[in-house]
Amino acid sequence: MNTLKLKDEDIQDAFPEIWKYLEDPDVTDLDFNCGNIWQSKVSSIPTRVENAFLTESYWEKFSALVGKSVNCNFNPQEHTAMADTQTLRITCLHKSQSKSGLTNVNIRKSHGGLRISREMALENGY
């Protein structure tokens, strides 16, 4: 399994259709599985994205780009491709390994800074 760094701009430029679901600072995850897109936010439970018009072939193209960017063939033998940007962690699972028979993609936001300071942790009893 290879993991290399990408730039956020690489994703924004190549896949603006995905980026629009990640722009909201409240969004934490975007998942494509079983043919559905799910968006998770800090303030609510995961919700299905309606009328996204992003097909299985679109996600396969996205996964192939992620695989290529990390020097992974992304095929049944190399069935997982993982990449990081400054703010995203991307994991793609090949359809040959998926129970649904479709490519699975998870895009998780990761912030560079600490969300909880030492003082905040002590104050709240963490």
Residue ranges and their predicted role:
Residues 1-50:
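N-terminal anchoring/assembly modules that precede and organize ATP-driven motor systems
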Residues 44-126:
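P-loop NTP-binding catalytic core
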